[in-house]
Amino acid sequence: DLYPVRPVRAGVPVGHFHASRPEAAGRRAAPEHLHRLRTLRRGLSDRLGPARRLSRGKSASRGSRRAFLAQMLALCRSRRSNRAFTSSPVPERALEMIVEAAHRAPTASNLQQVAFTLVTDPDTLRRITAFTVETFASVVRKLENPLLKPLLKVLVGGAYKYLPNFHRLIGEYGEGRDLILRGATAVLLIHTPDGSRFGCQDSNLAYQNASLMAESLGVSQFYTGFVCSAAGQAGHGLEKLLGIDGKIHA
């Protein structure tokens, strides 16, 4: 239900930004403010050729190879979750590079079923936060229900240690503070079709690539664990909210 609108700029053939088409054949169009990026199959030109040559020792001196490896290790060491965001949007070019890095991650059996949905619309970002908080509020009501509590303590006793965190998130949200997305101006959701056997693993490999690229670009980022947890608790609720076919993993 999506069609390519334009390729990623600067000749980067890693995927296409997609937008929704009008309603047709009973299919729901995806919201227009979502950038949908789907991976392409083999046959892409390789922008990482120089780095690969360095890693293989071709066309490079030992000194430059050592420098490359040192820089790579320094990047891995410097990667941090950083929730201190400004209100400025992330440059589109930086977002494109982050998505390309994610796309370059390996997938099980080279199936390449991983897809990416980039959300930059402020209202939709607020809806993601609201969905997450409401999901946790529902969990709290169940855990604290006096009729269910004896059974739940046996079945999911470990969940009760998270109650203080849930109450804090809900309370802060009620006072106008977002501890879910922390005021982020963009969220990249990584998902695969339902039934993808290694969808979770593939998606999290893609996340790590994206995380390292964001670090190298000086873009503050963190893993949205609360959002992923809420998505897992609520069936396909978040996917339906965002018009995503499949399951969000990262």
Write out the residue ranges for each language-model feature.
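Acidic, surface-exposed loops and disordered segments
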Residues: 1-250
